């Protein structure tokens, strides 16, 4: 059917009271960003719902984008007709017939903001219900949990009909909770952490530590591809790559093997603290899950968090690996994450890292390296890229083959 509008219903915005307008404005901006390449669209974000006027654009493609926008509870493709009951009958019958299968039931739900229209909501329900019963053989009325809900909205600019409700992504509009910085490795966990933070309204920027020649260009491209996948939920993301080679080499040379990982992570956290403050962020996010590996014990977290006063948020902290993998599969990051390109966290990993490092020793071993100079040179080499949904950074088959040779 040729839809004319998509009606969007908000998610958790109803809980925000006097801040509701700000949340709706943020959602409107995010929707416009997600639909930027549909030039004929018009987006009207009103208090109760959002109306997206299609003006001839492809409804299916638009709805595919809307499914990924946080802050949307659900939405319905709609058809506008003139304020004439014969036109309403014709369109409603066609809508119901398109969905009807033997044994199905229906009900009608009418809202009327144009109180000058000649019929009230009960009259519209009765008249339209009678027409559907007369023209759709075998259909029955059911007021509770029907198969088809025909929604009718009588507005000043016409009557809008819809019979399909599509679930949105839920959550809060990206940006309403402030800016966060994600430590994005090439693994399974950190993209899931980023997704979960974005779902709670965080404007997430992606920070990746890059250690050439120990890590390959394919590993960097893989991280950018993960960022592009996550950008589908916000419209675009900033990707920040930090050179980490010199830091890793000096740590390996001067720090005992058991504390290599701890001191390395302390330097990463120092750099994250600096970048987050430069970018006016409010928190650091990572994909640590309690007790999975040596860097993720509580003793390790104490030793690593020691270098920052910013909140370090871990959205997957209590999840099992199977739970994390399930989300990664759902958001299309899993297949990318398991591609065989090593990141900087694995290339210098010692065979037996300390699972319960001591804070005083961590500080003492870190003093053996030139923290100030190393950080200054790393920050001077930072590169930033704006990444949009659908951008291709990784020619999967060719790059995997080349890496394995």
From Swiss-Prot:
Free-text function comment from the UniProt entry: Catalyzes the ATP-dependent transfer of a sulfur to tRNA to produce 4-thiouridine in position 8 of tRNAs, which functions as a near-UV photosensor. Also catalyzes the transfer of sulfur to the sulfur carrier protein ThiS, forming ThiS-thiocarboxylate. This is a step in the synthesis of thiazole, in the thiamine biosynthesis pathway. The sulfur is donated as persulfide by IscS.
Compartments reported by the entry: Cytoplasm
Keyword Cell cycle: no
One biological process term in Gene Ontology: thiazole biosynthetic process
GO molecular function, one term: tRNA binding
Protein name: Probable tRNA sulfurtransferase
Xref: PANTHER family: TRNA SULFURTRANSFERASE (PTHR43209:SF1)
Listed pathway(s): Cofactor biosynthesis; thiamine diphosphate biosynthesis
Entry binding sites for ATP: 183-184, 208-209, 265, 287, 296
Pfam families: ThiI, ThiI_fer, THUMP
UniProt cross-references to InterPro entries, sorted A to Z: Rossmann-like_a/b/a_fold (IPR014729), ThiI_AANH (IPR020536), ThiI_fer (IPR054173), ThiI_N (IPR049961), THUMP_dom (IPR004114), THUMP_ThiI (IPR049962), tRNA_STrfase (IPR003720), tRNA_sulfurtransferase_ThiI (IPR050102)
Domain of life: Bacteria
Domain THUMP stretches: 60-165
Keyword set includes Ribonucleoprotein: no
GO cellular component: cytosol
Stated family: Belongs to the ThiI family.
Catalytic activity: [ThiI sulfur-carrier protein]-S-sulfanyl-L-cysteine + a uridine in tRNA + 2 reduced [2Fe-2S]-[ferredoxin] + ATP + H(+) = [ThiI sulfur-carrier protein]-L-cysteine + a 4-thiouridine in tRNA + 2 oxidized [2Fe-2S]-[ferredoxin] + AMP + diphosphate; [ThiS sulfur-carrier protein]-C-terminal Gly-Gly-AMP + S-sulfanyl-L-cysteinyl-[cysteine desulfurase] + AH2 = [ThiS sulfur-carrier protein]-C-terminal-Gly-aminoethanethioate + L-cysteinyl-[cysteine desulfurase] + A + AMP + 2 H(+)
EC number: 2.8.1.4
Record's keyword terms, sorted: ATP-binding, Cytoplasm, Nucleotide-binding, RNA-binding, Thiamine biosynthesis, Transferase, tRNA-binding
Entries under NCBIfam families matching the protein: tRNA uracil 4-sulfurtransferase ThiI
